[in-house]
From Swiss-Prot:
Its EC number is 2.3.1.15. It is a peripheral membrane protein. HAMAP family: Glyc3P_acyltrans (MF_00393). One of its GO terms (cellular component) is plasma membrane. The gene is plsB. Belongs to the GPAT/DAPAT family. CDD domains: LPLAT_DHAPAT-like. This is Glycerol-3-phosphate acyltransferase. Keywords: Acyltransferase, Cell inner membrane, Cell membrane, Lipid biosynthesis, Lipid metabolism, Membrane, Phospholipid biosynthesis, Phospholipid metabolism, Transferase. It catalyses: sn-glycerol 3-phosphate + an acyl-CoA = a 1-acyl-sn-glycero-3-phosphate + CoA. A motif (HXXXXD motif) lies at residues 306-311.
Length: 810
């Protein structure tokens, strides 16, 4: 019988290799699932299928996993390397598969009793033939069900390129023996647990059935909240109920997605072509976190940072290829233009107006629609920053969508809701040229199909893209930890805990996004070149600085989620030089090669520097203090950092608390000393003159931030009673003048938002009294600290500009 099965498998191999593509999930199971290939592996499949076996085996061999067709030999005993939980259909089905599997499990458990070093890993594996969830009003089942031979043939032809082999987290038999013993009941329990796992996996791969859009509209329009809003609309505008209902339907039609699985499959092919045209690879990290949440039945809300319009497509593409359901995406109404709007809608986009404050009907409809998505179990994605960052830094969170998410939890949401922060990064952002023009004062160009095509047509060779899933926040757990009484007050429309919770969770999302930063060659090369006054370094200096950056990021990690490049500084530089339209040039003179950043590209490069500025700000501050004092006691350095840190924390969403800050600073000092960038003797730190250039380049990352803080603080010294609005305006004007006089290219240097953030942090740190008047003692102490870290030339320019401004206004 075994020979016939092998012959049959060989017959299947040729057509299947032509029709079915290798699509393993995850892409590298050994690394991502932490598999120990030195211990025996047993693959657990849901049911007997020779077609599935051939596809699954081919993927195993391609991934360097043990061949499932061979047997495990343990202490002279040979046992199968795979088991089936259930019988299959038609040819070669395994009668008594359940009993056979239990027997094999028992034999493996018996071996664990006699060999203490043995740890067999059970890996659930399933082959997913297409992933259409089906429609609510149709009786068909998704194609993950058990298929017969004829159905498999059609599936191979139709879904061949959309067939995935899903490897799940391994179960340690050693752990099972230690925790539960090794009798026969444990073997049966293992089989039951594996069956439940496959059932959950099917749901996590396809998601709930797609809704009948019209039926969904009818249900929503009959909801109490929307009916009340319609009545209020009719009364306030003095129109009939019928007219208000038509307006409500129109709004709902404007908002709602119209997902089509066939459209998703088509765009998947297009996106595969697009990424290959534009990028040399998409690096995905920590997706296992999300798969775990999906298997546990969580309602998942993806909250990525927003760099580019292409973020919408990238995250859905990545999730689809990680075996997860692409989410419903909250997209700006500006993207609802022909023909993109209709296409986006079919891929899961639902549209939101930029502002709907005061529009009670729109607000009620949008809130109920979002709540309905949660209720039906669809994952959702929204951009908490509200719009794309033009500077490369995270923007302050807009809390409207988070507020509606918490309202959904508050109003009888039965499944746990987990927020998944996502870091999205690129070595070249498609719209970066447009951002630079807008920051120079050009009007924002309205989105249209022609603009999209023009951008894509002229770009290629953009390096790599990065998607890193940050630490999830399960809302009920967060609320129970920080607002223990939240359930008791849940009957109130807007309980006391609600607004602080929305603000705190939104802030924590930003912190977790930054904790998941993916550092790339472009970030590091750009940071080094922008740290030089002339935006140029010798090749040797640049490579030395890149090495210093790389060593510190590895030895003093910002967080365990940060992803670092694993190539040499030389390889990083060559990679950046090979990218198109970057503006990094090599020039030669009698002394060697100089790497230079074109002046016109300086503003563009600050975008990539700013992506990872939060990772460098503390080492830059340490370097800046030591450089300006030349020699300083550790205690004094720590004292200066403690004064400045709260403002950096608020502006850049840093995650260190006071105790963690002290540990991080000491580790940075030790690393600088290890690199011989500074001298460290007991409680005394000083510059190492032979490495002072490295220290100067490190310190440059803080200069513009300190200068901005100094501008605002100096204005407050001169005008302690100034209003917040005037303080923001005055700070911005002084910064603009300083940027012109001293050639500062950073686009955020005179951005009103960063001054607003700093002033808000001053208030939070009690630099203003209850009446809003400046607490001069505290401000003067902060001004003194800042003035010691800024050049005399800059200090004089700031003071002179402020005095001139006062003269003009008097």
């Amino acid at each position: 019988m075994a020979n016939f099965i092998n012959m049959y498998r060989q017959l299947l191999s040729l057509p299947l290799s032509a029709l079915v593509k290798n699509n393993p999930i995850p892409a590298n199971p050994i690394e991502e699932l932490s598999l120990n290939i030195h211990q025996p592996i047993v693959y657990v499949l849901p049911y007997t299928s020779q077609t599935d076996f051939v596809i699954f085996r081919r993927n195993c061999l391609a991934l360097g996993l043990p061949d499932p067709a061979e047997k495990n030999e343990i202490n002279g005993v040979k046992l199968p390397r795979y088991v089936y939980l259930d019988e299959g259909r038609r040819i070669f089905k395994s009668k008594g598969a359940k009993d056979e599997t239990t027997t094999i499990f028992n034999k493996y458990l018996e071996l664990h009793r006699t060999s203490e070093s043995l740890d067999v890993q059970l890996i659930p594996v399933s082959v997913l033939w297409g992933r259409s969830p089906g429609q609510e009003d149709k009786s068909d089942l998704p194609n993950l069900r058990l298929l017969n031979g004829i159905q498999k043939t059609f599936a191979a032809i139709w879904f061949g390129r959309d067939t995935f082999v899903r490897f799940s987290q391994a179960v340690s038999l050693r752990y099972m023996v230690v925790e539960h013993g090794s009798d026969e009941k444990i073997a049966q329990k293992l089989a039951r647990v594996a069956k439940m796992h496959f059932a959950k996996q099917r749901i996590s791969a396809t998601g709930p059935r797609l809704p009948n859009r019209q039926a969904m509209f009818n249900k929503l329009l009959q909801s109490e909240a929307i009916r009340r809003a319609i009545e209020d609309e009719a009364k306030s505008k003095n129109i009939s109920i019928e007219k208000a209902q038509k307006e409500a339907y129109k709004i709902l039609d404007e908002i709602a997605a119209d997902v089509s699985h066939s459209s998703l499959r088509a765009v998947d092919r297009f996106l595969r072509w697009l990424w290959n045209k534009l990028y040399s690879g998409i690096n995905v990290q920590n997706s296992n976190r999300v798969r775990k949440l999906a298997l546990e039945g969580h309602e998942i809300v993806y909250v990525p940072c927003h760099r580019s319009h292409i973020d919408y497509l990238l995250l859905s593409y990545v999730l689809y290829h990680q075996g997860l359901v692409p989410p419903h995406i909250a997209a700006g109404i500006n993207l609802n233009f022909w023909p993109i709007g209709r296409m986006f809608r079919s891929w899961g986009a639902f549209f939101i107006r930029r502002t709907f404050k005061g529009n009670r009907l729109y607000s009620a409809i949008f809130r109920e629609y979002l709540s309905e998505l949660f209720h039906r179990g669809y994952s959702v994605e929204y951009f908490i920053e509200g719009g794309r960052s033009r500077t490369g830094r995270l923007l302050a969170p807009k809390t409207g969508m988070m507020s509606m998410t918490l309202q959904a939890l508050q109003h009888s949401q039965t499944r746990p809701i987990s927020i998944v922060p996502v870091y999205v990064g690129y070595e070249h952002v498609l719209e970066v040229d447009t951002y630079a023009k807008e920051l120079r004062g050009a009007a924002k160009e309205k989105e249209n199909a022609g603009l999209v095509l023009r951008v894509i047509k002229k770009l290629r060779n953009l390096g790599q893209g990065f998607v890193n899933f940050g630490e999830p926040i399960t809302l009920s757990n967060y609320l129970s930890q920080h607002f223990p009484d939240w359930k008791e007050q849940n009957h109130e429309e807007k309980p006391q805990w609600f607004t602080p919770a929305v603000n705190n969770i939104s802030k924590q999302v930003m912190i977790n996004i930054n904790k998941a930063a993916a550092v790339n060659s472009m970030n590091l090369v750009g940071t080094a070149l922008l740290s030089s006054r002339q935006r140029a370094l010798s090749r040797e200096q640049l490579l030395e600085q890149l090495s210093s950056y790389q060593q510190l990021l590895q030895n003093v990690p910002y967080s365990t989620d940060v992803v670092l490049p694993n190539v040499t500084p030389q390889a990083m530089l060559e990679h950046v030089l090979a990218l198109d339209r970057i503006g990094v040039l090599i020039e030669k003179d009698n002394f060697g090669e100089i790497v230079r950043l074109e002046r016109s590209s300086a503003v563009l490069m600050t975008y990539y520097r700013n992506n990872i500025q939060h990772l460098f700000v503390l080492p830059s501050l340490v370097a800046s203090i030591i450089l300006h004092y030349e020699a300083i006691q550790k205690d004094l350095l720590l004292d200066a950092i403690r004064k400045i840190y709260p403002f950096l924390q608020g502006e850049l969403f840093l995650h260190f608390n006071e105790d963690e800050l002290n540990v991080q600073i000491h580790q940075i000092i030790n690393e600088f000393a290890r690199q011989s960038v500074i001298n460290s003797n007991d409680n005394f730190l000083s510059i190492n003159k032979s490495k002072v250039r490295i220290l100067q380049l490190w310190s440059a990352g803080m200069l513009e931030i300190l200068q901005r803080y100094y501008i605002t603080v100096t204005i407050l010294q001169k005008q302690p009673a100034i209003s917040r609005a005037e303080l923001e305006k005055e700070s911005q004007l002084v910064a603009q003048r300083l940027s012109v006089l001293h050639g500062i290219n950073a686009p955020e240097f005179f951005d009103k938002a960063v001054f607003s953030s700093f002033i808000a942090n001053l208030k939070e740190q009690r630099y203003f009294d209850e009446s809003g008047y400046t607490v001069l003692d505290k401000i003067e102490e902060l001004a003194s600290t800042l003035s010691h870290l800024i050049s005399t030339e800059i200090c004089l320019t700031v003071k002179g500009t402020i005095e001139k401004s006062e003269d003009l206004s008097s």
